[in-house]
Amino acid sequence: MAKKMKLSDITNMFAGMDVEALEGVTIEGDIEIDLGGLGGGFDPMLAAALGQESAVLAQHFARLAGMFGYPVGIGAPAAPAVSPALAAPKLKDLIPAKFDVANIAEWATEIQEVPIGNTSADGGSRGKRVMLGGEKALPFYFDAPMPNRNQVTIDVFDMRIGLAKAVKENYDEVMDSPGEWAKKNVEKFNADMITIHLISTDPLIKDTPAKEAAKTVEEVLQAVDVPIAIGGSGNPQKDPEVLARAAEVSEGERCLLASASLNLDYAAIAEAALKYDHDVLSWTQLDMNAQKELNRKLMKQCNVPRDRIIMDPTTAALGYGLDYAYTNMERIRLAALMGDDELTFPMSSGTTNAWGARESWMVSSPLKEDSDWGPREYRGPIWEIVTGLSLAIAGNDLFMMMHPTSVAVLKQITQTLFGMIDTEQVDVANWIGAEV
């Protein structure tokens, strides 16, 4: 294979020799011009590059000819012509765009409407029926109105329990009578619903028989005419029996049985709901995939109709817990709107769980170097309000709450956003100088 050399190599080879002229010397070879980097097609850019390379080649030959005694005059290669840059067009108008929440293409699925409570027209004795769901977008957008407002159910227990002082002072005189407790919640604190928790049935507390616990449900049904939710003690072995007996004595009232979960006999609870005309609360623990699984089993295995399922994805208190709860609920609602038919159900929040955070009820921080927490009489209700309002924005429909002030504030805010309450218009353009 012939050795390749550059013209500059030949020039450099004779540069160190005292040679004035060469006679009778012939240099033979092929000349290659490297145009690497240029694409195919002979265009003006290629022509300019080729001309420039040819000029450089001519310079090398001129220098070599001079060394051999044949000086050749040659000028420097001219710079390639540069086309003038085109001026960018001036922007006159922005690209037209419209944000229409009511017609977002990805949100093509409506949330299932689920009624709670049967009036006399429905075969029950409730004075009203609560309707949840029906949304076609995330909540509180004025251009995508919610068909049904948020509802609040206030907790009642079948025995006296330990409560935060700020809560207990509102119920102390009625805590020994579930019927009176429920009545006070409705008449004084404007509860939309009542949730009766049969916690005394827990074998580790009083182990109240299911038959006796059912009498408490009857007492509450006679005391108030709003729809009710019926909760067990949380014991996975006892709850199916307790809820089945409670469903029997409240037949035809369309109560919400709370709750079916993957760690107990959900099929027994679903069977009782179908047999005695009730709804089922599908409860999971901050896991969207588990929520899908339980909903699927209730529908496919237990044949629960879609209009009898309400989800409770779990509510954790302020802090990281609320972050998880909010994110989980928002993901569930967005997935439902985008067509996941295993998640297109209304959601319920155990907002009362806010009182499980020590910051909501402790007098002060246990850390000496910590800042002042402020009076717990205000701090606790605010804790519950913020928990509920955060989850309302995520798409929650039903709130289980305790403190009457928290109930009043949450209802006022959500009903204002819903459009039920008219408020004074505020000039937001003057936000710097506005008085608060």
UniProtKB/Swiss-Prot annotation:
Metabolic or biological pathway, per its Swiss-Prot or TrEMBL entry: One-carbon metabolism; methanogenesis from acetate
Biological process (GO), any one: one-carbon metabolic process
InterPro entries with a match to the protein in the record: Ac-CoA_synth_d_su_TIM-brl, ACDS_complex_subunit, CO_DH/Ac-CoA_synth_dsu, Dihydropteroate_synth-like_sf
Highest taxon of source: Archaea
Keywords from the named record: Methanogenesis
Role: Part of a complex that catalyzes the reversible cleavage of acetyl-CoA, allowing growth on acetate as sole source of carbon and energy. Probably maintains the overall quaternary structure of the ACDS complex.
Entry's family note: Belongs to the CdhD family.
Subunit structure: Heterodimer of delta and gamma chains. The ACDS complex is made up of alpha, epsilon, beta, gamma and delta chains with a probable stoichiometry of (alpha(2)epsilon(2))(4)-beta(8)-(gamma(1)delta(1))(8) (Potential).
Name of the protein: Acetyl-CoA decarbonylase/synthase complex subunit delta 1
Naturally occurring in which organism (per UniProt): Methanosarcina acetivorans (strain ATCC 35395 / DSM 2834 / JCM 12185 / C2A)
Gene that specifies this protein: cdhD1
